[in-house]
Amino acid sequence: MKGGDELARKWSWYFRNLNENNKLLLINFKKALLYRGIKEETVFEYQKDMKNLMEYLQKLNIRTLDVTNRDIREYLDTLNVSAPRKIRIICVLNLFYSHNAKKGYCENPMKDIDTSELREQLKKGDSNDK
């Protein structure tokens, strides 16, 4: 399948700066998402969102599975994206951490992240991606 080969090449290049633990976490996350029936292109977009968080955490010497709610909030504050994009990122992070929490690898730091303020922005019409 040509599309799958191209995506695999893009994946390996795009995630080259991540440490081995983070690469393994992303591979397992990808498998879980594909098992749920999520399209490969969507999975790649979700992985890009996770990669951005992982790179941020690596710079701070914080292990991805040791992240706290505060770390997540600080990361989200650094993002210069629209409300819809930030909501999607929060959903992706919640999927990732819920998956790993169910496996017993970590606590879910996303459980107290509230998107109501962002959703209110959507109602007011702030839907342009930055």
Residue ranges and their predicted role:
Residues 1-6:
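Short, Lys/Arg-enriched N-terminal segments with co-localized hydrophobic residues
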Residues 9-14, 27-124:
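N-terminal core-binding DNA-recognition domain of tyrosine recombinases/integrases
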Residues 13-23:
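A detector for short, charged/polar N-terminal pre-domain segments
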